Amino acid sequence: MFDDQDLGFFANFLGIFIFVLVIAYHFVMADPKYEGN
Amino acid sequence: MAEPESSTAAAGGSRLRNACGGVLCAFTLLLIGVLAFSIRLFSVIKYESVIHEFDPYFNFRVTQFLSKNGIYEFWNWFDDRTWYPLGRVIGGTVYPGLTLTAGTIWWLLNSLNIPLSVETVCVFTAPIFSANASWATYLLTKEAKGTGAGLMAAAILAMVPSYISRSVAGSYDNEAVAIFALIFTFYLYVKTLNTGSLFYATLNALSYFYMVCSWGGYTFIINLIPIHVLLCIVTGRYSSRLYIAYAPLVILGTLLAALVPVVGFNAVMTSEHFASFLVFIILHVVALVYYIKGLLTPRLFKVAMTLVITVGLAVCFAVIAILIALVASSPTKGWSGRSLSLLDPTYASKYIPIIASVSEHQPPTWPSYFMDINVLAFLIPAGIISCFLPLSDASSFVVLYLVTAVYFSGVMVRLMLVLAPAACILSGIALSEAFDVLTRSVKYQLSKLFDDSPAASGDSSAESSSASTVSTNSAKNETRPEKTETAPKEKPSKKNRKKEKEVAESVPVKPKKEKKLLVLPMEASVLGILLLIVLGGFYVVHCVWAAAEAYSAPSIVLTSRSRDGLHVFDDFREAYAWLSHNTDVDDKVASWWDYGYQTTAMANRTVIVDNNTWNNTHIATVGTAMSSPEKAAWEIFNSLDVKYVLVVFGGLVGYPSDDINKFLWMVRIGGGVFPHIKEPDYLRDGNYRVDAQGTPTMLNCLMYKLCYYRFVETDGKGFDRVRGYEIGKKHFKLTHFEEVFTTHHWMVRIYKLKPQKNRVRGKLKKLKSGSKASSTNAAGRKKNPWQ
């Protein structure tokens, strides 16, 4: 059964994972060529 | 030939990058929605799928009525089970947005053969709309500062504790949908500002209509947007887009708002809305001036201006004088009590105890800021700074939203909810800017590390040589084309880029535009990213903790952990179930107004006052009864046809939100209308106490007696665990009330009014003769004339 501790772990994991995903998005979209040129 | 190849490769690369970014963005948004929904389920998993607190019970009851009887019956619903004997016109006094939303969801699900109960739909409405609010935040922030900032802001809002506190599963209150409506209306306003599209302007008015349907906080929108328009005009940012964004909103929005019964003509008659009309007039004057300026020669324009200003000032003074006279002629100067208490934080505590008595209307403390927005409080200043680099209409709106929301959140703790989205947006912008610089640096350094082909090295050397001489602003415009209005024009023009290259070749250094590019060393960038992940991690852990521990309690079921394990206090439902099973359908139940909604919803009994608090005199009557001695209280309750009196008492289990702790408000509100109730009579040297030092008035009032009747039998001493001392008056009997039910933990106690004795002719004589025979007997009878 899915109890509150499981939900806590899930929410913590998902929250941090989303942070990482957002950083990944910034990394993907970053364009150093334009910055450099 | 090499140039077209490299340009197609670059175009292909950017297309691939955009495609990857798009997929990542969509996936992240989906996960943000999942997080926003799931983080609000602690209340269901830890407790049960149940409606929370007080107001949600009323909303639930209204939704039940709507789903059972349909929309027309709902509009015409006169509820005779509340505010007895006055009743309440529910259809005309309720904000119907939440109810209609949940009712529509329920109807849709049932049409699709998904037979969910109304209660289940109500319980999960708030988490669903939290996901919507996150996506709306993404859209708004994207309009202001680009997709990256939008994603970050949406992620932060999905789990911000301030919003969680009002939108956990079961918290079926107006704010649950209203925050979504608020953010979405702001998004559409900003979108209209950026595009100048009438389509978005119309959508904006419709969204505003939904907000008006949902929450009284719509006045925030109809004041904030005019302030922003005024700001734009004053700072010389007037444009036709501004006109399109504002004028349809005022006209269409006000017409639509007037359709909501609870607002009606207030939309044009109360001062909360006047600012929008005033700015509407100013906007037209400015538009006219710009139009005439285009038609006339500069000299003629100057003459015309002088003429217009002279006439205009005269007209303005006349209009302002009329407005002031109109406003001053209304009793509250055109402002409602709640709005006045927003502008003057001390107003409520001075004049409206019924507003001041609600804990959520108190000013917040500093720790509550840290609890509710956590690290965002420190990120906001950085967000404000990046909003000014460069300042656009959208970013100035975001800053203005934050500034006003900070002020209002300082007035009452409830409005932290309005601050939360602004805090999330600005923090999202700040973090996104940081991520932009850091990830760009990492990517730049990586490309420098791995590029070792001669051409590439030439490129990279060119990059590195020019890296320090590039204008950061233009670079930013290119990386995030959607960020500013001018960006879309700049992005597709490859010609411009070529021209720039040519210029760079021919003129290697342009001293005017030179600025150092923000490229950090690899180690610093990676460390920065890691530190920001750690910061984000702390924020996530705090939010999950707040959701799980602080904001999930439904308040009708309480729990406590001790060495023996988990204790569940389900006294409220026990009491309401008793009322529903053991009293007549038409019996009237009196209690303090806090429990009115619950009593009508759960016990289905008529109440005297409830959480709507529309009639101060009626509430003051109940307050006076509770503050009076037993006999006087019995007379008041009897005059209101009350059969049962319900009190909440926490002294046995240590539940601090009980009626004894709320009692001084009953005295204040009662004393506000009935001057014979005086607060000092209940205080000993200015201190409120119910121990042996308590005043006789306090120890003899009805509330004390109903709470502490037979309390001494529990432990032999009468020790009150909330107040932390033994009570003052331990042994007493009730003369006009009889105890009919006390819940398992003594948290709810229900008393019945003893019936009035029939007057029997000649009984007085008998009593008198009896008194001669036995004086003690007579004394006993005199004490209790109703038996």
Curated annotation (Swiss-Prot), chain A:
Residue ranges that the UniProt entry lists as topological domain Cytoplasmic: 30-37
The protein's name: Dolichyl-diphosphooligosaccharide--protein glycosyltransferase subunit 4A
Record's keyword terms, sorted: Endoplasmic reticulum, Membrane, Signal-anchor, Transmembrane, Transmembrane helix
Superkingdom classification of source: Eukaryota
Primary location recorded for the protein, binned into one broad class: endoplasmic reticulum
Residues annotated as transmembrane: 9-29
One cellular component term from this protein's GO annotations in UniProt: endoplasmic reticulum membrane
UniProt keyword Lyase, yes or no: no
UniProt subunit comment: Component of the oligosaccharyltransferase (OST) complex.
Presence of the UniProt keyword Endoplasmic reticulum in the record: yes
Main function: Subunit of the oligosaccharyl transferase (OST) complex that catalyzes the initial transfer of a defined glycan (Glc(3)Man(9)GlcNAc(2) in eukaryotes) from the lipid carrier dolichol-pyrophosphate to an asparagine residue within an Asn-X-Ser/Thr consensus motif in nascent polypeptide chains, the first step in protein N-glycosylation. N-glycosylation occurs cotranslationally and the complex associates with the Sec61 complex at the channel-forming translocon complex that mediates protein translocation across the endoplasmic reticulum (ER). All subunits are required for a maximal enzyme activity.
Record InterPro entries: Oligosaccaryltransferase (IPR018943), OST4_plant (IPR044165), Ost4p_sf (IPR036330)
Membrane topology annotation: Single-pass type III membrane protein
Side of membrane Lumenal, spans: 1-8
Subcellular location as annotated: Endoplasmic reticulum membrane
SUPFAM superfamilies reported in the protein's UniProt record: Oligosaccharyltransferase subunit ost4p (SSF103464)
Assigned protein family: Belongs to the OST4 family.
Pfam families, sorted: Ost4
Curated annotation (Swiss-Prot), chain B:
Assigned EC number: 2.4.99.18
Molecular function GO labels: dolichyl-diphosphooligosaccharide-protein glycotransferase activity; metal ion binding
Annotated stretches, region: Interacts with target acceptor peptide in protein substrate: 592-594
Cofactor: Mg(2+); Mn(2+)
GO annotation, cellular component aspect: endoplasmic reticulum membrane
Region (Disordered): 453-507, 759-787
Spans within the Cytoplasmic topological domain: 1-18, 145-146, 196-197, 235-239, 294-306, 389-394, 438-525
Motif DXD motif 2 per record, residues: 173-175
Membrane topology annotation: Multi-pass membrane protein
Skewed-composition ranges (Low complexity): 453-475
Key words, A-Z: Endoplasmic reticulum, Glycoprotein, Glycosyltransferase, Magnesium, Manganese, Membrane, Metal-binding, Transferase, Transmembrane, Transmembrane helix
Sites annotated Interacts with target acceptor peptide in protein substrate: 55, 360, 662
Major location category of this protein: endoplasmic reticulum
Sequence motif: DXD motif 1, positions: 53-55
Motif (DK motif): 659-666
Functional pathway: Protein modification; protein glycosylation
Pfam family, one: STT3
General function of this protein: Catalytic subunit of the oligosaccharyl transferase (OST) complex that catalyzes the initial transfer of a defined glycan (Glc(3)Man(9)GlcNAc(2) in eukaryotes) from the lipid carrier dolichol-pyrophosphate to an asparagine residue within an Asn-X-Ser/Thr consensus motif in nascent polypeptide chains, the first step in protein N-glycosylation. N-glycosylation occurs cotranslationally and the complex associates with the Sec61 complex at the channel-forming translocon complex that mediates protein translocation across the endoplasmic reticulum (ER).
Domain comment (free text): Despite low primary sequence conservation between eukaryotic catalytic subunits and bacterial and archaeal single subunit OSTs (ssOST), structural comparison revealed several common motifs at spatially equivalent positions, like the DXD motif 1 on the external loop 1 and the DXD motif 2 on the external loop 2 involved in binding of the metal ion cofactor and the carboxamide group of the acceptor asparagine, the conserved Glu residue of the TIXE/SVSE motif on the external loop 5 involved in catalysis, as well as the WWDYG and the DK/MI motifs in the globular domain that define the binding pocket for the +2 Ser/Thr of the acceptor sequon.
Protein family: Belongs to the STT3 family.
Name by which UniProt lists this protein: Dolichyl-diphosphooligosaccharide--protein glycosyltransferase subunit STT3A
Source organism of the structure: Oryza sativa subsp. japonica (Rice)
